[in-house]
Amino acid sequence: MAAKRKFDRRAAVRLAAELQGRLRRERRALPALALTTNSSVVTAVANDYSFADIFARQVEALTGRGDIVVGITTSGASANVLRGLRAARRCGAVTVALTGARTEKIKPLADLLLAVPSRDTQRIQEVHILLGHIYCELVERHILGE
C-alpha cells in the first residue's frame, strides 16, 4: 500500500515540477502544486481533522474559480482524493481525475475523467506518468503557439 501511494505521489510531483520548470521547451513557469509535498500541512490536517481531509483543506485554501485540480488515484476510491475533488468543485475549479478501471466513485466528481482500463496498479501508474507527460507537452505547444 505504501509503495502504491508513493508512486501516485510521484506522478503528482512530476506533473507539478514539469509545469513549473519545463518538460522539453523553454517557456514561462506555470503555477502548479503537488499537495503531497508539504509534510507539515499533511501532518497537521491529518492530526486535526483526518487523513481523508489532507487534500480538501489545501484545495479550499489555495483554489479559485477557473483553476484546474487534478486528482490521481489508481483505485478511483481514495477518500482523500475524492474529498479534494469535491472541495475543488465547491471552489469553482475544473476537475480532472486520473484513475484505473474502477470509476464509480470518482466519475461524478470529474469534469474530465481519464481512466486506464486496467486493475493492475503498476500499469495504471505507468499510464498516469505518460498522461502527465502528454499534458505537459500539449501545454508547452499551446504556450508556444504551435
Placement of each model-derived feature along the sequence:
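Glycine-rich, small/polar surface segments that engage phosphate groups of diverse ligands
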Residues: M1-T63
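Short glycine/serine/threonine-rich phosphate/pyrophosphate-binding segments
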Residues: R9-V13, A77-G84, I106
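Short beta->alpha connector loops at strand-helix junctions that form conserved
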Residues: T36, T73, T99, L114-Q122
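A charged, well-structured terminal subsegment
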Residues: A61, Q122-E146
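Short, well-ordered beta-strand core segments
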Residues: V69, T95, L113-L114
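Short, glycine/polar-rich helix-capping loops at beta-to-alpha or helix-loop-helix junctions
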Residues: L98-A110
